[in-house]
Amino acid sequence: MTLQETIIAQLGVKPSINPKEEIRKSVDFLKAYMIKHPFLKTYVLGISGGQDSTLAGRLAQLAVEELRAETEKDYQFIAIRLPYGVQADEDDAQRALAFIKPDVSLTINIKEAVDGQVAELAKAGVNVSDFNKGNIKARQRMITQYAVAGENSGAVIGTDHAAENLTGFFTKFGDGGADILPLFRLNKRQGAALLAELGADKALYEKVPTADLEEDKPGIADEVALGVTYHEIDDYLEGKEVSAKAQETIETWWRKGQHKRHLPITIFDDFWK
């Protein structure tokens, strides 16, 4: 088995999908998890305005609406805006919220918490790089989501999908930390197909993807940071042939990000050797 075949098998990616069927699978998955854990009453997710959180948010809202109708219990979806100061693409985030139609929408600005942490580190002689500060932002957002979930008998939804997981393009214990991943198995173009099926505005899934965590490189596109396009990543995940350069880049990211796909390493683990 080639590395490409191994990765595809591990991430469960299909070469083609039926968007309607995949929507049903994700909604049913979210419903089943909540029913199995009767102490859960809410799902919580941070909404950035990008494709992934927009899709996961809409799926979550559909799931709790169906659960309310079927059980007469007051399940809720809580969407959280988590800007650092003023978000440049706030209009996109508001467009996403209008599409998702969450039961509850909160806005919690993380700037003061992040800047306070960076300032305290500086007092201790630790000068945080812009890149590391970006990771602090991602982790602060997840701290906030878990705080909201903890006060509302909730589970935190993650937006990790196959293209992101393959490249390790997420912050460990930041946006990579969550309870449930309804998009896992889908690549980027498949996620866009689900949003199209759900009737989303094209702007919500044709927008250039960016993590937008670094202040020295505001709005830097994921594809620029990765050195490979999502089209190439998606082709790779669908078992198609890509250029030698793209394959090398993709597989380098896979190896480099292995530690992000595991729980903390124990003496019994050998994947890292």
Curated annotation (Swiss-Prot):
Homodimer. One of its GO terms (cellular component) is cytoplasm. Its EC number is 6.3.1.5. SUPFAM superfamilies: Adenine nucleotide alpha hydrolases-like (SSF52402). It is an enzyme of class 6 (ligase). Keywords: ATP-binding, Ligase, Magnesium, Metal-binding, NAD, Nucleotide-binding. PANTHER family: NH 3 /GLUTAMINE-DEPENDENT NAD + SYNTHETASE, NH(3)-DEPENDENT NAD(+) SYNTHETASE. Mg(2+) binds at D52, E164. One of its GO terms (molecular function) is glutaminase activity. NCBIfam families: nadE (TIGR00552), PRK00768.1 (NF001979). GO terms for biological process: NAD biosynthetic process. This is NH(3)-dependent NAD(+) synthetase.
